[in-house]
């Protein structure tokens, strides 16, 4: 089967073609988002201050912490919807959508309030440079107040992803990105609001993208219509979504805490080092986007085929996806390291910032292929309904290995040595994930009822 109005049935036909065609719109959307992030960093770094650039960089893991729980639940929704669609259960798809949005509407205000209250304590834990404190606080307060748009967008994307539709998600991202860039330029250059303008632009764009997404889905896909305030909540089905999605959300939250632990150490070396770290992080994230897109594709592919009882296609699809991820990561890592100086110079003319960014890339990019394998295999296991093991594996590698080793190496050998901890954590986690997948321990996790 192929596609109908963007909805893709991946239980028959070429796995390579399905995965590739699902990945391409996601990849385009992710590049759009990163293009905005680069424009954002370019505007802030060149027209505001290094303090503002550090503020935006520090803000990312904090915002990720607050959105990660619902992002995980959205992943659980993607898996349940994919399995239900692959198994020919449109009634179950409908119930999953209603249950997801009912839970979202009931919990968004408490989540937002908690985020606002935790801004100052988290900044203290992160040891934000006093020179960047005011700008960081402004950025975080504004973006936390607008979490509804970011979380709502993730829910819409999760619903469509389960149905094999990534092209419509690209449309939503395009709306957000174009509006975000326009607002960035208007509120920073035309109206000099500084980091406040950047934060307002982000919140307004995300909110508009979410609301546009609801309108578009309801108009184009009536069978998936979203009813935020009058959907029927299916407690049993939502528990299945939570079973799959909560470990993923907890994993992302704890990884965000681990990232804040890293930032706490990074921030202790001053504004220039922090800004350089953030520039390097943006560049490595950009090179990793295809793997993230492939991982999202394999979740939907595995979910649909588990629902259709096609485990043979699951294994075939995973092999194809891992191969594509490895080839891309090796090539992109070499390219980014080779051009690390001119790429870093795009974001800041400061030699100290450039030096910190280059060193980050030289240490982190070579072992990235291990993370690519780990990322795809964990996503495949989530698609099969096994999300507890990936959570334990990744959390152990980050919290128990990366962060302690980072502090140990930095204290013993200096700030550049902290980056070696990335490869150590990825190597251990990758070996464990390969073993878990090869042993078939993810099988039997799918529940059709």
Predicted regions span which residues?
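Short alpha-helical transmembrane segments in multi-pass integral membrane proteins
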Residues: 1-23, 81-148, 190-246, 302-367, ...
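Hydrophobic transmembrane alpha-helices of multi-pass small-molecule transporters
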Residues: 65-68, 180-184, 210-214, 286-289, ...
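Small-residue-rich hydrophobic transmembrane alpha-helices
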Residues: 53-113, 150-169, 263, 277-340, ...
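Helix-terminus/linker motif at the lipid-water interface of multi-pass membrane proteins
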Residues: 35-53, 123-130, 186-193, 253-282, ...
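Transmembrane helical elements of multi-pass membrane transporters/channels
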Residues: 21-40, 142, 176, 205-209, ...
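Transmembrane alpha-helix boundary and packing residues in multipass membrane permease domains
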Residues: 26, 30, 42, 79, ...
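Short runs within selected transmembrane alpha-helices of multi-pass transporters and secretion channels
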Residues: 74, 142-161, 169-177, 198-211, ...
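N-terminal transmembrane alpha-helices
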Residues: 10-47, 61-76, 80, 105-112, ...
């Amino acid at each position: 089967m192929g596609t109908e109005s963007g909805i893709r049935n991946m239980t028959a036909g070429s796995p390579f073609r399905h995965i590739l065609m699902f990945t391409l719109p996601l990849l385009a959307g992710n590049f759009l988002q990163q293009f905005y992030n680069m424009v954002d960093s370019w505007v802030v770094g060149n027209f505001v201050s290094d303090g503002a650039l550090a503020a935006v960089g520090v803000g990312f893991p904090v915002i990720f912490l607050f959105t990660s729980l619902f992002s995980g639940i959205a992943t659980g929704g993607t898996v349940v919807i994919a399995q239900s669609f692959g198994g020919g259960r449109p009634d179950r798809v409908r119930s999953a959508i209603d249950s997801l949005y009912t839970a979202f509407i009931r919990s968004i205000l408490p989540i937002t309030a908690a985020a606002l209250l935790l801004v100052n304590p988290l900044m203290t834990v992160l040891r934000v440079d006093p020179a960047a404190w005011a700008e960081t606080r402004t950025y975080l307060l504004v973006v936390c107040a607008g979490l509804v748009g970011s979380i709502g967008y993730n829910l819409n994307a999760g619903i469509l992803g389960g149905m094999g539709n990534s092209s419509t998600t690209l449309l939503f991202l395009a709306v957000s990105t174009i509006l975000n860039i326009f607002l960035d330029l208007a509120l920073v250059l035309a109206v000099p609001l500084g980091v406040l303008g950047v934060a307002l632009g982000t919140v307004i764009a995300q909110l508009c993208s979410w609301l546009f997404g609801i309108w578009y889905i309801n108009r184009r896909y009536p069978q998936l219509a979203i009813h935020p305030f009058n959907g029927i909540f299916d407690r049993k089905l939502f528990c299945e979504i939570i079973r799959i999605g909560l470990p993923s959300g907890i994993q992302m939250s704890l990884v965000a805490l681990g990232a804040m632990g890293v930032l706490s150490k990074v921030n202790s070396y001053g504004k220039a080092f922090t800004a350089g770290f953030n520039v390097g992080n943006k560049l490595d994230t950009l090179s990793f986007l295809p793997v993230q897109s492939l991982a999202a594709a394999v979740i939907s592919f595995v979910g649909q085929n588990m629902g259709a009882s096609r485990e043979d296609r699951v294994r075939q699809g995973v092999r194809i996806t891992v191969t594509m991820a490895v080839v891309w990561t090796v090539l992109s890592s070499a390219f980014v390291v080779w051009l690390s100086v001119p790429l870093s110079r795009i974001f800041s003319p400061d030699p100290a910032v450039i030096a910190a960014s280059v060193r980050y890339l030289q240490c982190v990019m070579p072992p990235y292929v291990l993370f690519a394998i780990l990322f795809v295999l964990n996503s495949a296991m989530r698609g099969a309904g096994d999300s507890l093991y990936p959570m334990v594996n990744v959390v152990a590698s980050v919290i128990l290995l990366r962060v302690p080793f980072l502090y140990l190496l930095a204290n013993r050998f200096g700030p550049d040595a902290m980056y070696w901890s990335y490869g150590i954590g990825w190597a251990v986690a990758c070996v464990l994930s390969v073993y878990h997948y090869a042993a078939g321990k993810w099988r039997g996790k799918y529940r059709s009822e």
